[in-house]
Amino acid sequence: MLARPDVFPGARAAACLTQFKRQSPLIHCLTNEVVQELTANVLLALGASPAMVVEPTEAAQFSRLADALLINIGTLNASRAESMLAAIEAANAAGTPWTLDPVAVGGLAYRTAFAQSLLGEKPAAIRGNASEIMALSGLQASGRGVDSADDSLAALPAARELARNSGAVVAVTGVVDYITDGQRDWAVAGGDVLMTRVVGTGCALSAVVAAFCSLPGDRLDNVATACRVMSHCGEMATRRAAGPGSFTPAFLDALYQLRPEDLQ
């Protein structure tokens, strides 16, 4: 039986969030068209600055200026792939950390091949559900589009292997999130099923992961903090919301009101 990793300590999350609020990073988000507004609002609520620059020549230029880059392949096409490759090349040249969200990898051939081709481009972090992480690592998965039929703990060995092979911190998210650098693991519980009834919460989490990758220090802790921030605020929002329609504003309010001591 696969042993469950230790729970990520609240004190470490609080310290990371304190540092994040001091830094207020600029995040270049090449994300999918469905989730841009929620992604931008989540980053703004946390105190970060989002930008979505998609023209290939500008994407490269802006990635050199940003503190972190997000690559989300949810609405991938040839033009967007060109922008992503240009942004990644520029980010790597500038030493800017970039995060991959491999949306629906494993179910569709074009995006699967594209995402796998990016693994050699030194991502700082990879965030996906169990099916996406298993497929990206080369294992059989049972996802359907952006949904996962696999358990996050069952995907942890694949996440570890993916982390070792890519050099990235890998977050496999679900009812419990597991974060690994291939050698060390953290578990982050929390959140609520209501988060799965609103489009874009997972994609927004990937943007928050990218933002926390801009911080110095232990990247494993930084990515785990991103997961803890989102799960905690999801819980807080659910207490105030009557359903999906009222969840989103409550979630943004919870992110805006979040204090480091709330994560203790």
Curated annotation (Swiss-Prot):
Which residues participate in ATP binding? R127, T173
SUPFAM superfamilies for the chain: Ribokinase-like (SSF53613)
Q: What cofactor does its activity depend on? A: Mg(2+)
Please state the Enzyme Commission number of this protein: 2.7.1.50
Q: Which amino acid positions bind substrate, per UniProt?
A: M52, G200
Q: What are the protein's UniProt keywords?
A: ATP-binding, Kinase, Magnesium, Metal-binding, Nucleotide-binding, Thiamine biosynthesis, Transferase
Does the keyword Transferase belong to this entry? yes
The reaction(s) annotated as catalysed by this protein in its Swiss-Prot or TrEMBL entry are: 5-(2-hydroxyethyl)-4-methylthiazole + ATP = 4-methyl-5-(2-phosphooxyethyl)-thiazole + ADP + H(+)
Is the Nucleotide-binding keyword given for this protein? yes
Q: Tell me the GO molecular function terms.
A: ATP binding; hydroxyethylthiazole kinase activity; magnesium ion binding
Q: Name one GO biological process term.
A: thiamine biosynthetic process
**InterPro entries tied to this protein:** Hyethyz_kinase (IPR000417), Ribokinase-like (IPR029056)
Metabolic or biological pathway, per its Swiss-Prot or TrEMBL entry? Cofactor biosynthesis; thiamine diphosphate biosynthesis; 4-methyl-5-(2-phosphoethyl)-thiazole from 5-(2-hydroxyethyl)-4-methylthiazole: step 1/1
Family statement drawn from the similarity comment of this UniProt entry: Belongs to the Thz kinase family.
Task: Tell me, in a sentence or two, what this protein's role is.
Answer: Catalyzes the phosphorylation of the hydroxyl group of 4-methyl-5-beta-hydroxyethylthiazole (THZ).
Q: What is this protein called?
A: Hydroxyethylthiazole kinase
Query: What is the originating organism of this protein?
Result: Serratia proteamaculans (strain 568)
Originating gene: thiM
